[in-house]
């Protein structure tokens, strides 16, 4: 199971562990916490909830929010609610934990394969259309493209040095998954340790240049890694220094003549 669902289930388990299998009386539950007015503008009537009820309802919202955020799993929310209620009174679940894990693994595998196929199709369609746009250069047909946003006049990248740069990585939909913008200074990146499309797409890039790379999943992470499977990756790169290795080898003023 992925980390998200482990976290969700762990949270639910923690909440359920606090509850007793004995059914509490409604009067006892009603007495917990001080009554504070709670108004939900989306409800037809104003209602009052105790602090305990507020916490309980908010926990339900947080759980539902996690379910709603999921792009790869589709739960029947009504059945989730029934499962919560049944567990609180110690009723048996339709599956054992082992059966659940096995079934979940099967479902996740099918969802993963479906998502991989969809993303690959989107990537290939994007590259095909993008190749028609002005200024787009194909390094490898249907696999790797770049577009220069700002020309540079300094030294050009050759091979796989450690380059000093700023970058922003995003998906086709514009969602940013990684960036150096949060740093107050550029990062030193050994190109020999990057994905193939990144290093290859930077060849010939000059200091001061800004270019955008469009990388097919075959030259990126494919179906491996933490990103969605077969994602096309888009990197906007501003090259500060083509080879920081050479700069590091130059003696500093204080060391000259020693």
Swiss-Prot record:
Its EC number is 5.2.1.8. It is found in: Cell outer membrane. Residues 1-15 form the signal peptide. It comes from the Bacteria. Gene3D superfamilies: 3.10.50.40, Peptidyl-prolyl cis-trans isomerase, FKBP-type, N-terminal domain. Residues 160-243 form the PPIase FKBP-type domain. PPIases accelerate the folding of proteins. This is Peptidyl-prolyl cis-trans isomerase Mip. The gene is mip.
């Amino acid at each position: 199971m992925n980390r998200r669902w482990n976290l969700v289930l762990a949270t639910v388990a923690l909440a359920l562990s606090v509850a007793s299998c004995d059914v509490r009386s409604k009067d006892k539950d009603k007495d917990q916490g001080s009554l504070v007015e709670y108004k939900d503008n989306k409800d037809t009537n104003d209602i009052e909830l105790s602090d305990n009820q507020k916490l309980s309802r908010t926990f339900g919202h947080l759980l539902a929010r996690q379910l709603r955020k999921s792009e790869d799993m589709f739960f029947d929310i009504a059945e989730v609610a029934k499962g919560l209620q049944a567990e609180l009174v110690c009723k048996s679940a339709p599956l054992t934990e082992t059966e659940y894990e096995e079934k979940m693994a099967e479902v996740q595998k099918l969802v993963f394969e479906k998502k991989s196929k969809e993303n690959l199709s989107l990537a290939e369609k994007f590259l095909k259309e993008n190749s028609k746009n002005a200024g787009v250069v194909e390094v490898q047909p249907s696999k790797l493209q770049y577009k220069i946003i700002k020309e540079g006049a300094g030294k050009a990248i050759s091979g796989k040095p450690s380059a000093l740069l700023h970058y922003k990585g995003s998906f086709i939909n514009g969602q940013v998954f990684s960036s150096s913008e949060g740093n107050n200074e550029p990062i030193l990146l050994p190109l020999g340790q990057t994905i193939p499309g990144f290093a290859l797409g930077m060849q010939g890039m000059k200091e001061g240049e800004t270019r955008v790379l469009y990388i097919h999943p075959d030259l990126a992470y494919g179906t491996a890694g933490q990103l969605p499977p077969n994602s096309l990756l888009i990197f906007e790169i501003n090259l500060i220094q083509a080879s920081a290795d050479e700069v590091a080898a130059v003696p500093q003023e204080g060391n000259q003549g020693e």
